[in-house]
């Protein structure tokens, strides 16, 4: 929850810290809940680190992505992607409206998948007693290298159901959602066809998705 990104580079064989990379362009990086090992995204020879600026609870903190080249010990000074400041998606979110990503999938090339919480654009706030059930999270495809993000053809889900996503062996992406239109369900998105289909309906709100293989 600090104002500075800090990443320790560790020699696991020697059990020693080699260096600590620090950068004040974004706030603390990593996820509070790292049960799916998503604090770091390794893609195209870089380690990408994301800050959600304490979910908006800390005014003045900056959210976004930084990266470290694999094998190096400092953040790449030529790369930053400030999500709130830089990202606009027609019909979804405007630049400078606070927004944050849930933990992403592993990378497929330089692309990852996540849910983008745009509660500010939808005029929802954390102080709403029912905020966890408000449908404010939009499934998105992210290209980390190109710094692009696009909304996918799946409805907004609640923040409770904004963690379950998985890239299958065939390259399609499975999302677990809780939407107003489709209820609690699983969708499969095909990046080649740019289409999504509902593949299952379930009773409880789906959260984590953990592949067993």
Residue ranges and their predicted role:
Residues 1-3, 49-64, 114-134:
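Short, conserved, GDST-rich strand-edge loop motifs in beta-rich repeat architectures
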Residues 14-35, 71-98, 145-160, 202-213:
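Surface-exposed loop and turn segments in beta-propeller and other repeat-based domains
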Residues 3-66:
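Loop-centered beta-sheet repeat module
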Residues 127-129, 139, 147-198:
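C-terminal structured domain segments
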Residues 32-47, 95-109, 118, 158, ...:
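Structural signature of eukaryotic scaffold interfaces centered on beta-propeller domains
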Residues 92-157:
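C-terminal structural cap/anchor segments
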Residues 2-16, 61-74, 129-145, 186-193:
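Beta-propeller blade signature
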Residues 46-49, 112-113, 172-175:
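Conserved beta-propeller blade signature
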């Amino acid at each position: 929850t600090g104002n500075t990104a800090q990443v320790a580079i560790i020699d696991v064989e020697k059990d020693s810290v080699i260096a600590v990379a620090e950068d004040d362009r974004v706030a603390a990086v990593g996820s509070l809940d790292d049960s799916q090992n998503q604090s770091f995204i390794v893609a195209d020879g870089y380690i990408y680190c994301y800050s959600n600026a304490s979910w908006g609870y800390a005014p003045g903190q900056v959210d976004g992505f930084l990266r470290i080249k694999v094998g190096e010990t400092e953040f790449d000074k030529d790369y930053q992607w400030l999500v709130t400041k830089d990202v606009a998606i027609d019909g979804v979110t405007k630049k400078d409206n606070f927004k944050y990503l849930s933990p992403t999938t592993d990378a497929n090339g330089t692309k990852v998948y996540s849910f983008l919480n745009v509660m500010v654009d939808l005029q929802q706030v954390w102080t709403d007693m029912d905020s966890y059930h408000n449908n404010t999270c939009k499934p998105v495809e992210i290209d980390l290298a190109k710094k692009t993000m696009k909304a996918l053809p799946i409805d907004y889900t609640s923040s409770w159901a904004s963690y379950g996503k998985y890239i299958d062996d065939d390259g399609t992406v499975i999302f677990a959602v809780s939407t107003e239109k489709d209820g609690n369900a699983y969708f499969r998105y095909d990046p080649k066809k740019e289409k999504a289909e509902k593949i299952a309906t379930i009773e409880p709100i789906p959260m984590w998705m953990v592949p067993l293989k």
